[in-house]
Regions:
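Hydrophobic, lipid-facing positions within transmembrane beta-strands of outer-membrane proteins
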Residues: 53, 70-74, 107-111, 170-174, ...
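Transmembrane beta-strands of outer-membrane beta-barrel pores
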Residues: 59-63, 92-96, 117, 128-132, ...
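Face-selective signature of the C-terminal outer-membrane beta-barrel domain
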Residues: 156-275
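Outer-membrane beta-barrel translocator/channel fold
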Residues: 5-6, 98-106, 112-172
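Acidic, small-polar-rich N-terminal luminal/periplasmic segments of exported/outer-membrane proteins
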Residues: 1-52
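Short strand-turn segments of transmembrane beta-barrel domains in outer membranes
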Residues: 27-33, 41-76, 97-98
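Surface-exposed extracellular loop regions of Gram-negative outer-membrane beta-barrel proteins
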Residues: 69-112, 263-275
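Outer-envelope beta-barrel architecture signal
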Residues: 51-55, 82-86, 118-122, 194-200, ...
């Protein structure tokens, strides 16, 4: 949905939705906010219920080989029983970049397990997100773009030629609930989704984000008319390195009251406690 996004021009790079209402606002690990369009989260993870094993494989590419943009998507899902299934989803997207040191690669792996019984259900999984972004700091001289025509953008000078950002994210999650119908079920009731019920549930989430930025002084633009990218080098006179990580643990117990139909006007009433 929405009206598109503004991005740096390369697949896999930083982006932001043009619709302000759709822009993410990360309370945890804000460094990853620029990659929200590429991240898999528990809310975005897919679960499947298939009659037969299902496999899907797609590969897309475009552009010249030296500036290639490509995407690889792979999915496999199958049932252990009619109500229990497991699946794996993998995505790899990226580009070699139009300008010097502009390449990007984003990868996602999602493993899922689900069981939906008449009263008990569970959805659990593991997610791995990874991004490797080369950072060139931008075009050194705007005139190379506005006043001159270059047939080969890769010869245009940039501020940084060997800087890189790396991101990694590991997520373990689980949501389970047990439903207690407020009236006796019949053999014809496949589920209690349309019956007055009370659900007791538990959700767990552990997420760890890690980011590392590196560059070198030798990889920075030089010249009499070039202002130094950094004014000072404090710890290492030839290179810089910055790393950050954050871990998030969430453990909650909740109760849902379903007065009538789950999809009705009053679907569910929620209450819970957790940390």
């Amino acid at each position: 949905g929405g009206i598109g996004s503004a991005y740096l021009g390369n697949l896999g790079g930083a982006s932001i939705p043009l619709d302000a209402a759709l822009r993410p606002d990360y309370r945890n690990f804000s460094f990853a906010q620029i990659l929200d369009a590429y991240l898999v989260t528990p809310d975005r993870a897919n679960f499947y219920n298939t009659k037969k094993p299902f496999t899907h494989l797609s590969y897309f590419f475009g552009g010249q080989k030296k500036r290639l943009e490509e995407s690889l998507w792979a999915t496999h899902a199958q049932q252990i029983s009619p109500s229990t299934g497991m699946n794996i989803d993998y995505k790899s997207r990226g580009t070699r970049g139009t300008y010097t040191n502009q390449g990007a690669r984003d990868k996602n792996l999602s493993l899922g397990f689900s069981h939906t019984g008449k009263k008990y259900s569970i959805h659990a999984g593991y997610i791995y997100n990874m991004a490797s972004l080369k950072e060139n700091g931008g075009i050194l001289r705007d005139g190379d773009i506005t006043d001159t025509v270059f047939d080969m953008p890769e010869v245009i000078d940039v501020y940084l030629t060997d800087a890189k950002n790396e991101y990694k994210n590991n997520v373990f999650y689980l949501t389970q609930s047990y439903g207690m119908p407020l009236r006796r079920l019949s053999d014809e009731d496949f589920s209690i989704a349309e019956r007055s019920s009370v659900f007791i549930g538990h959700s767990f989430l552990y997420s760890r984000f890690w980011r590392k930025y590196t560059d070198t002084k030798s990889g920075m633009a030089k010249g009499e008319d070039v202002k130094p990218y950094y004014e000072h080098w404090y710890i290492n006179p030839t290179a810089s390195r910055d790393s950050t990580f954050e871990s998030l643990l969430s453990n909650k117990v909740f109760v849902q009251l379903q007065p009538w139909d789950r999809n009705g006007v009053v679907g569910v009433i929620n209450a819970g406690i957790g940390y």
